[in-house]
Each structure stands twice: as C-alpha cells, then as structure tokens.
Amino acid sequence: MNVTAKSEHSSLTNQDVNWFLFDETLWVTKYKEYMQIDDSIAYSMGSFNWLYESNDTVLFHKKDARFETAVIGLSARIKLGFADKYINYICKGKMGNLYYAENKNIDFVFSPAFIYDENQDLLLSFHDNFSHKKDYVLFITEDFGFVIIDHQLKGWVLQRASRHVCVHRKRNMGIAPHMIARYLSALDVWEEKEDMTELESLLAACKQEGGVFYEALKECMMNLI
C-alpha cells in the first residue's frame, strides 16, 4: 500500500486506539461501532475486510486521502517475543498524518508476524528490512504509529499497549502486561493443540478477583469449546 506522510496534527488521539483482547482486533478509529465503519466505505478508499476475505481494514477519506480507520485482525497472529532491536527506530519516530497515495481500492494485509513484548509493553508488526536512513515510524497518536518502508505501509507499533486493552467495550482495565502475556501464551497453546489447560489455570488465578476480565475470559473459553 503506497502512502505519504505530512507533518501535521492528526485528529485521532490515544482514546481512539483500542485493543479488543478477546475479540482479537485492534481498532484505530473515531468510530465506536462496526456498522459506522461499514457505512463509511461509501466515501472511503483503501482496503476493507469484506465477508469471507482476510484483508485488514485500512481506510482513507476519498476527498483528501487522509487516514481515517484501521481495523487489524490479530487472531492467531500474535507471538510473545522481544522488541529490543526495534526500540531505537520507535524512539526516533515522528508525529504526523498518513495519506493514501493510490487511486483505487486494494487488498491489503499486514505482516502475519505480530509481537507482544511484555517487558516493553509493546504490540507491533515490524520488518527487519527497515532502514534508518529512509524509513520511519509515523505516530498518528502518542502511542500508535505506522511503519513506513520505501513509501509503503508495512507495519505498525502500539506503545503502552496494556493501557489500550478493551474488555466488553471498557478500556484501560488495569490489566498488567504479564497477565496479557499469560493469556496470549495460553491462547496460543489452545490454537496449536486445542489444549485448554493453560486457559483454565489462568481462569482459576483470576477467579478470586472476579470482575470484567474474569467474566470475559470465562465467556471466551465457553465460545472455544
């Protein structure tokens, strides 16, 4: 996906970046409901995840090509890992606005390799062919940025990721990074082996505190059965 960047203020804020942990999607948009995103397609260009397709949704306004919405599918794509080698690039990122540089809709999917670094509390999709001389991270909010390589949209970065976790539409639940990592690890075991042992262990650990996270985890496990 060809894009350009401008050094200008984005209309999006950190409040518009939501990681729906149990729905396995990352939303970067002013819209609160999926129907609103669906309605916006009439005046948007870019990539959209139609029924039975696996595209990531990345939409730009037809009028001025300005970025508006991203809905990134995370299902079976997040692995626990270390993001140390990317930190320097992220720290040198710049603020701005993203613009579409094509004149048609396309099929677009971010790299399937997503990493969550518990120690850095970073969720990201990064490419090893990143060149510090010409490539950059463009932050459109304080915490969320796109990875631009050779004028193409190639990845993204979410700093302080745990603060953006949403459970049952409630954000910033105070879920610690180590709990997120434990859930992602348990989910990975389920997806690879259909073994619920780790998920059941996590549910038992959360039972005493109860709350929204416990109820959502229990519901998630029931849906998996």
Regions found by a protein language model. Give the residues of each.
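Intrinsic disorder/low-complexity detector
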Residues: 1-49, 58-59, 69-125, 164-225
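Generic beta-strand structural signal
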Residues: 56, 112, 142-144
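A cross-kingdom feature marking solvent-exposed beta-strand/loop segments within repeated
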Residues: 39-53, 130-143
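Conserved mixed alpha/beta catalytic, RNA-binding, or beta-rich assembly cores of soluble enzyme
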Residues: 133, 139-145, 160-177
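Amphipathic N-proximal alpha-helical interface segments
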Residues: 57-67, 145-147
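Short hydrophobic beta-strand segments that form the core of ligand-binding sensory/regulatory domains
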Residues: 72, 157-158
